[in-house]
């Protein structure tokens, strides 16, 4: 079995290799699939992520989706990585300045409103790779697994991965007891529930 570091390298290379116009077209398709799935109507309080401003890592940029959700009156929160290694969600306001963290990922200022885990209906999670059973391979920091693991499973929000189809692993990914599976994924190919 390939180790996680090798898998991360391989799948990050694949998403970085996508031309910018392909990434933009994929992001547009993901917005359409998000609303076709019914998620746009059912969920008012949404945890999402912000991508590096330079776009160098090839992650799906959610800017268009977040703008549309805010215009529909949805409450958006995005992660802030704390110095001690934890992740918390803070209210996102597109009109407020964002500060880049040590990973060059924009975050709201810590004076923004803190949002507790159980107050989210849905979390849109970034990922490096996923498989057809909902296993998510992240960047390796464990932030999302620790954050989601701290929420009682009965109160846990719906967890939807956002990815390019090229990030789909044709073989099962490694999975540990503390890993949290995705409930679904959205790629440019569509919405795929796992449960």
Where are these regions (language model features)?
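Receiver (REC) domain switch-region micro-motif
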Residues: 46, 123-124
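Glycine/threonine-rich flexible loop motifs
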Residues: 58, 132-141
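Surface-exposed, charge/polar-rich loops and edge strands
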Residues: 1-9, 13-17, 109-114, 118-123, ...
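Flexible, active-site-proximal loop/turn residues at the rims of small-molecule/cofactor binding pockets
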Residues: 52, 129, 191
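N-terminal active-site beta-alpha-beta segment that forms phosphate/nucleotide-binding
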Residues: 1-118
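Short, surface-exposed, charged loop/turn segments at secondary-structure junctions
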Residues: 93-95, 137-144, 176
């Amino acid at each position: 079995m390939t180790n996680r570091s090798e898998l991360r390298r391989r799948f990050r290379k694949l998403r970085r290799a996508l031309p910018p116009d392909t990434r933009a077209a994929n992001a547009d398709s993901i917005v359409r699939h998000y609303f076709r799935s019914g998620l746009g109507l059912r969920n008012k309080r949404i945890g999402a992520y912000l991508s590096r401003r330079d776009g160098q890592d090839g992650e799906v940029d959610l800017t268009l989706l977040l703008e549309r959700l805010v215009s529909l009156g949805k409450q958006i929160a995005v992660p802030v990585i704390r110095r001690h290694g934890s992740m918390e969600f803070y209210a996102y306001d597109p009109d407020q300045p964002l500060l880049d963290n040590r990973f060059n990922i924009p975050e709201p200022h810590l004076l923004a409103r803190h949002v507790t885990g159980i107050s989210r209906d849905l979390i849109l999670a970034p990922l490096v790779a996923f498989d057809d059973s909902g296993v998510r391979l992240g960047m390796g920091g464990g932030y999302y697994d620790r954050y989601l693991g701290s929420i009682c499973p009965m109160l846990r929000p719906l967890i939807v991965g956002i990815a390019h189809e090229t990030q789909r692993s044709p073989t099962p990914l490694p999975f540990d007891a503390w890993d949290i599976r995705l409930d679904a994924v959205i790629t440019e190919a569509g919405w795929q529930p796992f449960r």
